[in-house]
Regions:
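N-terminal glycine-rich phosphate/adenylate-binding segment common to multiple enzyme folds
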Residues: 50-159, 249
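Buried hydrophobic positions in well-ordered alpha/beta secondary-structure cores of metabolic enzymes
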Residues: 12-15, 69, 135, 173, ...
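Glycine-rich phosphate/nucleotide-binding loop
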Residues: 49, 234-338
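Internal helix-turn-beta structural module
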Residues: 314-368
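Active-site rim loops that border cofactor/substrate pockets in soluble metabolic enzymes
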Residues: 42-50, 203-244, 248-253, 280
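Glycine-rich phosphate/diphosphate-binding loop of Rossmann-like nucleotide-binding domains
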Residues: 7-24, 28-33, 151-228
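Short, glycine-/small-residue-rich phosphate/pyrophosphate-handling segment
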Residues: 114-145, 160, 165, 285-322
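N-terminal beta-loop-helix "entrance" segment that forms/cooperates
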Residues: 35-59
Length: 368
């Protein structure tokens, strides 16, 4: 029986309320199904930790991440007014901790399943199922290289992409497409590269590398789309897509559009992979005004726990771990289909604890 070492890193804001709920979902899946063991290590980092200690993260965190199989993390950054007056305002610490947990430890590829769970209502007309997968380049692109202001009348940012990072990005997209069942429309396995090719040299370079990579995946089609057209088609006809691949900033935008049509930020999970320790986290931010008030949505954290177990289980060829992820997902869907508790952001009136407990009870009822 395999044992998995998982770092639990709530970081800032509402993460301290909801990330332990995701950890509890994983532990409950283990208790119900067996077949795998979990060793959970709770650690601290982020803006609030910096305000209290003067350090961005606890001593030994890099070493703990190096020994871990994955981490379940919250969001970094806290923009409380009083905190902004301190020596550690959110914009100074939040961004570095986020970048450290991504490119700082080599997690240069972002994954976001855009899946509409059963029981959730899609805002798109006549759409009741969505299953698209977004792969985003995290280690390069517009967000990575520091820009600067030029005098009082101009500013400059730099967009740089390299062959090595782009090959890793493309390889991840094609590998995921090969492992999926294809697009819902007709089962064809495909990668759609969305950017502004023909306008920006870096994006033409993306086309070149993706075309080269596609030769090693004859079973996966490669398509190109201008990102504005891609956004339109994602809203009109999401079934035409299987795997979508985008540059960092473009992927950020497309990912949030995808979150909107699959239940919102309070539902969607995301992951950063490829480095020392893969990071799994809810798509939402720190939401500081909800901290400790028992009205934050716990479902994204629970969904993220399911994604962690499924992804690591797939990488390690461990069906027991993947079954744990499936159990959590089925329990989420059971709650939604049976009109169970929903938090205010979903149109309900239930609190964080009651919503989470409903899913935990459902885990005891559903079968795989």
């Amino acid at each position: 029986m395999e044992k998995y070492n998982i770092v639990i890193l709530p970081l800032d804001g509402v993460g301290k309320d909801v990330i332990p709920i995701g950890a509890r979902a994983m532990e409950k899946a283990r208790q119900i199904l067996g077949g795998f063991e979990l060793e959970l290590h709770y650690c601290e980092a982020g803006v609030e930790y910096a305000v209290n200690t003067g350090k961005m993260m606890e001593d030994g965190l890099p070493e703990k991440l190096a020994m871990a199989d994955a981490m379940l993390a919250g969001s970094g950054g806290h923009y409380d007014l009083e905190m902004s007056k301190s020596s550690y305002p959110g914009f100074k610490i939040g961004s570095p901790i986020v970048q450290y947990l991504r490119s700082g430890i080599g997690n240069n590829v972002g994954l976001r399943p855009l899946r509409l769970l059963k029981g959730l209502t899609c805002p798109l007309r006549n759409v009741d199922e969505i299953d698209v997968y977004l792969v985003r380049q995290l280690g390069e692109g517009m967000y990575i290289y520091p820009g600067h202001q030029i005098g009082e009348n101009a500013a400059c940012d730099t967009l740089v992409v390299t062959r090595k990072a782009t090959e890793e990005f493309a390889e991840a997209a094609f590998s995921i497409a090969r492992g999926r069942n294809g697009r819902r429309q007709d089962g064809r396995k495909m990668v759609t590269l969305g950017n502004k090719h023909g306008c920006i040299a870096c994006f033409d370079f993306y086309r070149k590398i993706f075309t080269e990579t596609s030769l090693r995946y004859p079973d996966v089609e490669l398509h190109f789309a201008q990102v504005d057209a891609l956004a339109e088609h994602l809203l009109k006809d999401p079934d035409r897509f299987d795997v979508i691949a985008c540059e960092n900033m473009i992927g950020d935008i497309i990912g949030d559009i995808g979150a909107y049509i699959t239940g919102g930020m309070g539902i969607t999970p995301t992951a950063d992979i490829g480095g020392l320790c893969p990071q799994f986290r809810p798509n939402h931010g720190t939401f500081p005004r909800a901290v400790g008030k028992n009205f934050a949505n716990p479902f994204a954290s629970i969904n993220t726990a399911a994604m962690l177990l499924d992804t690591i289980g797939m990488q390690r060829n461990d069906p027991a771990l993947r079954a744990g992820g499936e159990l959590i997902l089925k329990a989420l869907e059971y709650n939604f289909v049976n009109e169970g508790p929903r938090t205010k952001d979903m149109g309900g009136s239930d609190n964080t604890v009651d919503a989470a407990e409903a899913v935990f009870k459902a885990m005891e009822k559903v079968t795989l």
